[in-house]
C-alpha cells in the first residue's frame, strides 16, 4: 500500500512569523517614501483617519489610535499649526469641536498616496504575472483580517 504524500499545510503561527517582518518592512518603506513631503508617517496616518471621519473629536481620535487624549492633543496641535487640519464646531452640537483636513492637508494626502502608490507599483512591476496574481489574491483575506 502506497502512502499518499501531500504538501505540508502552513499553520497560522508559521505564516504569521513570515508575514510580520514583511509587513513591517513594507510599512517602513512606505513611511520613508513621504519624508520629503514634510510629514511623518504617523502624521499622515492621523490625516487619513481624520479624512475618513470628518468632524471626529480629539478624544475619539485618541481612542481610535489607542493613545491618551493629552498625547493626541499634542499631535493634533502640530497638525493644526502646520495648516493641515482645522477645528470646527459640530453642526449637531455647537459645544463639540470636530477636526477636518484642510485644503493643504488634502493636497499633502494626495501627494502621500501618489508617492506610495508609485513606489509600490514600481516594485510590483518586477514580479512575474503569477506572483502578481498571488499578491492580488492575498489582498482580500488580509483586508478582512484587519477589518475585524
Feature map (PLM): residue ranges:
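Charged, amphipathic alpha-helical coiled-coil/dimerization segments
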Residues: 55, 77-140, 147
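A short, structure-level motif marking secondary-structure boundaries and short turns
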Residues: 15-16, 32-33, 42-44, 59-62, ...
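N-terminal leader segment of winged-helix/HTH proteins
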Residues: 1-41, 141
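Generic structural concept
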Residues: 16, 20, 43, 47, ...
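N-terminal helix-turn-helix DNA-binding core of bacterial DNA-binding proteins
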Residues: 28-70, 82-84
Amino acid at each position: 500500500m502506497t502512502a499518499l504524500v501531500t504538501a505540508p499545510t502552513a499553520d497560522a503561527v508559521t505564516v504569521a512569523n513570515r508575514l510580520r517582518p514583511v509587513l513591517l518592512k513594507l510599512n517602513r518603506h512606505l513611511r520613508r517614501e513621504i519624508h520629503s513631503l514634510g510629514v511623518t508617517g504617523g502624521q499622515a496616518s492621523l490625516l487619513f483617519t481624520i479624512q475618513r471621519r470628518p468632524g471626529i473629536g480629539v478624544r475619539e481620535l485618541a481612542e481610535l489610535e489607542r493613545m491618551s487624549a493629552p498625547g493626541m492633543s499634542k499631535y493634533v496641535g502640530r497638525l493644526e499649526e502646520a495648516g493641515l487640519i482645522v477645528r470646527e464646531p459640530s453642526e449637531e452640537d455647537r459645544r463639540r469641536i470636530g477636526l477636518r483636513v484642510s485644503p493643504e492637508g488634502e493636497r499633502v494626502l494626495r501627494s502621500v498616496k501618489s508617492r506610495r502608490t508609485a513606489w509600490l507599483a514600481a516594485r510590483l512591476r518586477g514580479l512575474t504575472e503569477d506572483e502578481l496574481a498571488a499578491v492580488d489574491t492575498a489582498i482580500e483575506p488580509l483586508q478582512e483580517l484587519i477589518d475585524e
